[in-house]
Amino acid sequence: MKPKRLRLALAAAATAGLFLAPAAGGGSAEFDPLLDGAPLCAAPAGGPPALLRHLVLAAAETAPFQPAPPRPALGEAPVLYANLGTLSFKAGTRNARAQAWFDQGIRLAFAFNHAEAQRAFREAQKEDPRCALCFWGEALVLGPNINVPMLPEASGPALAALAKAVELEASAPARDRFLIEALAKRYSADPKAERAALDAAYADAMAAVAQRYPGDDTILTLYAEAMMDTQPWDYWEAGGAKPKGRGAAIVATLEQVLERNPRHPGAIHLYIHAVEASTQPGKALPYANRLPALMPGAGHLVHMPAHIYYRVGMYRESLAINKRAMAADEAYFRTSPSDPLYKAAYYPHNIHFLMVSAQMGGDGTAAIAAAAKLDAAMPAEVVAQFAIMQPVKAAPYTTHAQFAAPDAILALPAPPANLALVAALHRYARAVAFAQKKDVAAARAEIEAIARIGRDADWKPFAEWGVPAKEIVETARVVATGRLADATGDLDGAAKAYEDAIFIEDSLPYTEPPYWYYPVRQSLGAVRLRQGRLDEAEQAFRESLARVRNNGWALAGLAATYKRKGDAPAARATQRAYAAAWFGDAKGPALDRL
């Protein structure tokens, strides 16, 4: 056995040990933990994924929010919204308007609309120029967060706002003074100061504030966020079972808040991020369900349950919530000039999530419509400047490969050649289309074009952003090879290609949505089923479901496998799970499209 195939076999065997193996003699119980809501048996590869984080950073660098110029640069006068919930944090002011603007700033800060939050804090300062915490709030939102490191142009305004807060703190309540003093640890006038050390110092200072005020839910939430900013998107060791760094303290702090206040929107938002890459993302589900109603005007918070819905296999709910998030953002854009960063990154993220949720549930119509909207939201000239944007720009081609007719795929316009990853996925879609048409020569030409891109493109810009672009391209090449072999009846060749693709897919780091659009194990299972190798088909489908819950494509294949095996109880249980998960074409997926 070749080393790569051996490693794949060992990985499969290790995974198989984590869930129920087929019963001896082919029997199977009605209850199956893969079909009935058990924790995930396998988490994605560890490490910081940061797809949204880097997408946001790229948008920030493309059109950064400029806080330093005079107030008109912030746009029209902000609106005091009535649809951002009721979270309140006393700001040491007797001015009701100042408190209202301050509360809006805090709400928007927890919703990651930091530029709009700054506008609110500035309005609070206008209403009460002696409100120390109103200046603290502005300094807070100009700092780093889990999606964006602190931008150089924000340093001056942050220090200025902090200095004003310090100037006013003598007359502020004690709690406010402690918060201001803690935030002072986060910033330095020295441009050479190490950001990681400043972030750690701030987190440590917030730990002391949290110890002084253990009953203050917002302070504990701010403390948790300070810890998260020291290791953004990297809270779990590989496998997702063991917390990493401050990960255990982050989770414990947020759970302490949510146990007594399960409606704190900031704590829910951060808790979703804290556990989504773990083996138990479902722990956040009850809170995620509440979040959209708590701040219905904050599109990003309306979207956030999708991070859990997708991980636990609730694709129908993920699709629906992202529609609501898009509507909330579009309403917000009509009333505010908006930060270009928010509009160019967070809003397309909602569209992307909607698209992949529709893909997983089999809703080709919704997926293709979202693909068009996503493509339009990401201009090629902007994407060309930032490699991190290319996986998202390329994603619509995978939607067409999955659902569109071959001729429709072949009619798609080619992307600019300088978008290497996008071009490779365009070639992938074309290879799939030609394979379906059984045009072997044309499919091989497209596969060779993918290989050529993999060999010749400059992948360094992608590596700098942490994007495994070369691995994505190689996955595309190998899957396309499998599709062609499958279409021409070479099932052994197809199985080998899919096994090779699985090996690469398993190495891709965690991000939501995933870097590769579907679990390739379902394709391997479909081939083994058509070969009559039923135990291997069952294993492939079950391994797929252990990684990607409630995947209707894999459930359809597994149900067909049990039917072929004569295992009626297992077939019934799987068919029920499939019926609940699938919301696409009533005929269901064809085996050769898995």
Regions inferred by a protein language model and the residue ranges of each:
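Canonical tetratricopeptide repeat
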Residues: G137, L222, L270-Y271, M304, ...
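N-terminal alpha-helical interaction modules that lie
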Residues: G26-Y271, E276-A284, N289-M295, V312-L319, ...
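TPR/Sel1-like alpha-solenoid repeat signature
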Residues: F135, Y309, I321, A485, ...
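Extended HEAT/HEAT-like alpha-solenoid repeat tracts in very large eukaryotic scaffold/adaptor proteins
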Residues: A344-H349, P468-A476
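Generic long, charged, amphipathic alpha-helical segments
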Residues: A476, A495-L545
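C-terminal non-catalytic interaction modules
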Residues: Q539-L594
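Gram-negative bacterial Sec-dependent N-terminal signal peptides
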Residues: K4-P22
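Histidine-centered active-site/metal-ligand motif
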Residues: F110, H264, H269, H273, ...
